[in-house]
Amino acid sequence: MNSKILFLGAVMMLPTFASCQQEKPFPDDAVDKVYEYLPEWQAGYLDIHQISTGRGNAAYLIFPDGTTMLLDAGDLGVHTGTQEIMNAVPNDSKRPAEWIVQYIKHFSLPLKNNGAIDYALLTHFDTDHIGQNGKLAIEKVGLDYKLTGITHVGNLLDISTLIDRGYPTYDYPTAAKVTGAHISNYKLYVTGKVKRMKGL
C-alpha cells in the first residue's frame, strides 16, 4: 500500500518537474532590434516614453493629435543613497532635466515645435517627481528659484500648462504634508510662471 502511494505521489510530481525543465522559446526577432531607434511619431499614434535618468521619474507622451505631455521630471541629486539605488543614466555628464530635454527635442522633431510641452502634469511633490533643492540645484542670476527637475525643464523648454495637485493654496491633503525646501522652490517657480503669463 505504501509503495503505491509513493509511486502515485512521484507520478503527480512529474508535471511540476517537467514544467521547470521546459526549453526556452526560440529567440524573438525583437531582441535583435533592441538598439534601433524608435520610429518617429505619426499623426493618429499615441507615443508613451518612459525616460530613465536614474535620478527620478519622467514620462513623455505625444497624443494622436500631436498634443504633448510631460509626466513628472524628478531629480534626486547625487548622493550615496541615490547611487546605491541606480546609477545616473545614461551618465552624470548632464543634469536629469538636460537629459529629459534632449530626449524630448529628439522625439518631438515631427511636431516642429522645438520640444515645447503642451501639458506638464506632476503626480505628487516628492523629489523624484519634481526635483530636489540641495546643493546640486542650480542657481541662476535673475531667478527666484533654483533649477532642478521640473523647474529646470521649464527653464529649458516652453511649458504651456502646468498641472499639479495643489495650486494655488498647496494644502492638499494638508498644508503640513506639502512642505520642504524642494516644494518651496517649486512654488517660487510657479509664482514666477503665473506672473509671466499675466505679463507682470
Q: Predicted regions: what is each one?
A:
Residues 16-19:
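C-terminal motif of bacterial Sec signal peptides marking the signal peptidase cleavage site
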